[in-house]
Amino acid sequence: MIFDEANFSPGGDRYITVEFGNEMNLELNFMAQGLAGALREAGTKGLVETAPCFASLLVHYEPRDISYGDMVTELKSLIGSLGSTDEIELDSRLFTFETLYLDPWTKECIDDYREKLNPDKEYDPDFVARLNGLEDRHQLVRVHSSSEYWVASLGFWPGLPFLQPLDPRAMIT
């Protein structure tokens, strides 16, 4: 669901979480990315950094330079100036890289894990296929490899991308 108005929540004494909705879709991510860009461009006093995610933006600010209330006021103003997500322009690049599916090296690692730690563990590709109502691991590969992906966020592990398929039919849980 896309919220009618953004929700603002304090995170300790120097963070604000701005939530635009509670689902994964490009419109919400563009709002988070657009607000992050608008904050940088505005040169907002006290801004330390931003961390956009699928449907939210974490804002790190310096409370000695700007209060929580003043930062929320600034955020609301910038959200109002963003306009439609159809009009938001984001810098992006296209990367192509090889992806291995069902390779023997990964299977060997999973088999080793199962043997030593969890003999009842289902093979991951089979589990993901079953969880998503797909016929088998081969259909999983076809579905996953059928779309280009948008990097919606970078994760806690340096450089770990949180990906969102541009074709919603390739959305996998």
Q: What are the functions of these language-model segments?
A:
Residues 1-173:
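Conserved "landmark" site that anchors the functional core of diverse proteins
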